[in-house]
């Protein structure tokens, strides 16, 4: 038989889709054919999650109000959160979760040919106490791109309450500060540490990204290697390559004693 058959690349569609190319590369990527992001935002109360979400969906330097054809927000707390009042004014909002809401969005999108489907966003904000294990939201986490959902954002105070399906399909991870729950942070570091060279590297990256209250770590898991940012501003790590000295970071709050990190390649920024 000679040489074996070779895998040929699949050609990109001939028509150009430049929607989303205007988005800053430090933000979760939502453009391209079949593109989109499942973004998890994890943080305690009063750590700036509402401000972050308001900026993402209202600030013209981010996605703004004109990026998506439709935005659906489900939030148990939005009616009582003064920070989110402009989101409530701008978008279609329910202060509860229901599978019927998700089902209705899916059925509406299925009315269109794929190329004609509206480009939409769904935000599920602090709903996990009312979202069951078999909820349609979790099923959507592995299929959202089929319905041209370009942004599926899920915010939670408790990482371990987020379905494994959502965690496995997460494209972008944002962790706010301060993060007082030691066990939660260790769980996150165990789950995502390998992509940056281990748990200790992950904790050092988080600490370096969040020196002040309301700072956050953004991990772009769509990139290869994974890119880590301080807020949406500064690239601080790519995979195991850290652009700071991890040995200078005090990790005592996570371990009860300082840990030496010796597995990263460091490079001055």
How should these model regions be labeled?
Residues 6-13, 141-144:
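Short, mixed-charge, low-aromatic patches
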Residues 39-60, 65-66, 76-80, 95-197:
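Conserved P-loop NTPase motor cores
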Residues 71:
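An amphipathic, basic-hydrophobic helix/alpha-beta surface used to engage anionic
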Residues 82-91:
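Short, aromatic/basic amphipathic alpha-helical patches
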Residues 94-98, 237-240:
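Short, flexible N-terminal segments of the mature chain
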């Amino acid at each position: 038989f000679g040489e074996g058959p070779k895998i040929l690349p699949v050609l990109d569609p001939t028509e150009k889709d430049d929607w989303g190319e205007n988005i800053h590369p430090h933000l979760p990527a939502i453009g391209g054919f079949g593109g989109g992001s499942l973004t998890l935002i994890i943080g305690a109360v009063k750590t700036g999650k509402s401000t972050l979400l308001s900026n993402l969906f209202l600030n013209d330097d981010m996605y703004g109000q004109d990026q998506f054809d439709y935005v659906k927000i489900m939030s148990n707390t939005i009616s009582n959160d003064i920070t989110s009042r402009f989101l409530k004014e701008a978008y279609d909002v329910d202060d509860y979760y229901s599978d019927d809401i998700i089902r209705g969005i899916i059925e509406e999108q299925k009315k269109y040919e794929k190329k004609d489907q509206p480009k939409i966003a769904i935000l599920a904000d602090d709903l996990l106490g009312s979202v069951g294990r078999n909820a349609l939201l979790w099923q959507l986490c592995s299929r959202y791109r089929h319905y041209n959902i370009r942004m599926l954002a899920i915010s939670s105070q408790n990482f371990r309450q987020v379905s494994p399906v959502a965690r496995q399909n997460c494209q972008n991870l944002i962790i706010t500060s301060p993060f007082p729950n030691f066990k939660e942070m260790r769980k996150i570091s165990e789950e995502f540490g390998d992509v940056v060279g281990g748990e200790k590297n992950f904790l050092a990256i988080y600490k370096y990204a969040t020196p002040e209250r309301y700072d956050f770590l953004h991990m772009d898991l769509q990139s290869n290697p994974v890119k880590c940012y301080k807020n949406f501003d500064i690239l601080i790590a790519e995979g195991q390559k850290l652009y700071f000295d991890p040995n200078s970071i005090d990790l005592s709050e996570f371990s009860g004693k300082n840990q030496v990190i010796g597995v990263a390649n460091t490079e001055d920024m």
